Swiss-Prot record:
This is 2-isopropylmalate synthase. Pathway: Amino-acid biosynthesis; L-leucine biosynthesis; L-leucine from 3-methyl-2-oxobutanoate: step 1/4. Homodimer. HAMAP family: LeuA_type1. GO terms for biological process: L-leucine biosynthetic process. It comes from Listeria monocytogenes serovar 1/2a (strain ATCC BAA-679 / EGD-e). InterPro entries: 2-IPM_HCS-like (IPR050073), 2-isopropylmalate_synth_dimer (IPR013709), AIPM/Hcit_synth_CS (IPR002034), Aldolase_TIM (IPR013785), LeuA/HCS_post-cat (IPR054691), LeuA_allosteric_dom_sf (IPR036230), LeuA_bact_synth (IPR005671), PYR_CT (IPR000891). Residues 390-512 are annotated as: Regulatory domain. It catalyses: 3-methyl-2-oxobutanoate + acetyl-CoA + H2O = (2S)-2-isopropylmalate + CoA + H(+). Catalyzes the condensation of the acetyl group of acetyl-CoA with 3-methyl-2-oxobutanoate (2-ketoisovalerate) to form 3-carboxy-3-hydroxy-4-methylpentanoate (2-isopropylmalate). Belongs to the alpha-IPM synthase/homocitrate synthase family. LeuA type 1 subfamily. Residues 4-266 form the Pyruvate carboxyltransferase domain. The lineage of its organism: Bacteria, Bacillati, Bacillota, Bacilli, Bacillales. Mn(2+) binds at residues 13, 201, 203, 237.
């Protein structure tokens, strides 16, 4: 039985999804959940890319105790040095170095010859090997690279000290047959194939990321890279939950085992969906809302008689609990904290106290507090505590058929209160115009989404927004409240605050 390692890049490649920006606290929360999930390697970020990313990688390296943490680096000594510094507190640090090997990338992006690329690989892998015990090399755009040159580049990296070779399908170009053949070619040509770890990193542009990853495993790969829910730039990445469950359900075929704790997938998926603002499609394999629903009468009858008739995956396998009991206003701290742990949250003692206080307030307003309410409660607490701006007062003047007005008062992190007013063709526009005046930013709203957290008239509203600033950068915000307008204001204020903070950091870097 072969052992397959799981390499999660939700915090690096997943964050490249337009509009997804995790702050440090959110990244640590995700990393801790990935650790509970049994992920072998967490790619925490790209340390050289920005001071913020460096600090995130550093914080995650310090927080994670039971799996490896890695950082991305180009074939540049400064990148490698920065990664080493960020990962110095990691229990098991690794580094992930990449350089393109396809002709189109070498000619138009790198402006390097094949000989120069090989020389760079040799030098920088050797340099990194002096600092890291585990060095992973990725020949970017491998699936569009000349096969003979790709093999030469891989051999060069191994000879220089690479311990892991990752084969990226960077633009989602290949198919399972071709990708499997590529690994067969590598096995045939690379003399050390069985002595090091080969991995795959697939994108989903043609909808074949999971199938390609499984084809790689069939043909010798012992590490799979991907993200939770398959998030990532463009069409996304290999969805790790799909690969893990496929290996488990079809163990007879793949003859593979993993360290993954399968019943933590639902918690992981929910957490990342809420923090990223990307809802999981209801028909998504493994963790979608309809994954275990049966509409057909014939199917329903069969499942009732024997679930094996139409269910190859049980909900409990991935942590979907259909019998979760709601909490209420009489529930105590022990029951509340136990439920938090079951849902995958790791809270400090103070965070537990704050969360329980908010829970009691929520329980007074609702007859039953469901798991969805609890996710929203923790998410709201986490996001609001990290914000530089807090909504203190909102007043909307509504006239049917007329111009709407809004008055907004916010508190800045230093305690200063500022207030302004503006109008709009609707209540939401009036609120957002007012916040734009307060924040003194040129902001474009690119996405607005509202959903009820639970059913019933006492449901809380959860609003997600994505904005774009004048530099073209996108930021996500979330707001939760019983009042839709208040939730909308909180979401927009949070996204605007992220944009303002990012602009300040960019200005600082430019001056420095």
């Amino acid at each position: 039985m072969k052992k397959i390692q799981f390499f999660d890049t939700t915090l690096r490649d997943g964050e490249q999804t337009p509009g997804v920006n995790f702050d440090v606290k959110e990244k640590i929360q995700i990393a801790l959940q990935l650790e509970k999930l049994g992920i072998d390697v967490i790619e925490a970020g790209f340390p050289i890319s920005s001071p913020g990313d460096f600090e995130c990688v550093k914080a995650i390296a310090k927080a994670i105790k039971h799996c490896s943490v890695t950082g991305l680096a180009r074939c540049v000594e400064g990148d490698i040095d920065r990664a080493e510094e960020a990962l110095k507190d990691a229990v098991s640090p690794q580094i992930h170095i990449f350089l393109a090997t396809s002709d189109v990338h070498m000619e138009y992006k790198l402006k390097m010859s094949r000989a120069e690329v090989l020389a760079s690989i040799k030098h920088h892998i050797s340099y990194a090997r002096q600092k890291f015990e585990v060095v992973q090399f990725s020949p970017e755009d491998a699936t569009r690279s000349d096969r003979a040159f790709l093999i030469e580049a891989v051999q060069t990296a191994i000879d220089a000290g690479a311990t892991v070779i990752n084969i990226p399908d960077t633009v989602g170009y290949t198919n399972p047959t071709e990708f499997g053949q590529l690994f067969q070619d590598l096995r045939r040509e690379i003399k050390q194939f069985d002595d090091i770890t080969f991995a795959s990193h697939c994108h989903d542009d043609l909808g074949m990321a999971t199938a390609n990853a499984l084809a790689a495993i069939e043909n010798g790969a012992r590490r799979v890279e991907g993200t939770i829910n398959g998030i990532g730039e463009r069409a996304g990445n290999t969805a790790l939950e799909e690969v893990a469950v496929a290996l488990h359900i079809r163990k007879d075929f793949y003859q593979a085992e993993t360290n993954i704790v399968l019943n933590q997938f639902k918690n992981s998926s929910d957490l990342i969906s809420r923090l990223s603002g990307m809802p999981v499609p209801r028909n998504k394999a493994v963790i979608g809302g309809n994954a275990y629903a049966h509409e057909s009468g014939i199917h329903q009858d069969g499942v009732l008689k024997n679930p094996d008739t139409y269910e190859i995956i049980t909900p409990a396998l991935v942590g979907v609990d259909k019998n979760s009991l709601p909490l209420g206003k009489l529930s105590g701290k022990h029951a509340f904290n136990t439920r938090m742990e079951e849902m995958g949250y790791t809270l400090t003692e103070q965070e537990q106290k704050d969360a329980f206080k908010r829970f009691k307030q929520l329980a007074d307003a609702k007859k039953e507090v469901t798991e969805e309410d609890l996710h929203a409660l923790i998410l709201g607490q986490s996001s609001e505590s990290a914000d530089d701006f807090e909504l203190k007062h909102l007043q909307v003047q509504y006239v049917t058929g007329g111009v709407q007005g809004a008055i907004v008062r916010i508190e800045e992190r230093d305690g200063a209160l500022v207030e302004d007013a503006a109008t709009g063709s609707g209540s939401i526009e009036a609120i957002y115009n007012t916040i734009n005046r307060l924040m003194k930013q040129d902001i474009e709203l690119t996405d607005y989404r509202i959903q009820a957290i639970t059913a019933g008239q006492d449901a809380q509203a959860e609003v997600h927004v994505v904005i774009k600033n004048d530099k073209g950068a996108e930021f996500h915000g979330i707001g939760i409240d019983f009042d839709v307008l208040t939730a909308s204001a909180k979401a927009y204020l949070q996204a605007s605050g992220k944009s303002k903070t990012a602009s300040k950091q960019a200005d600082f870097e430019e001056v420095k």
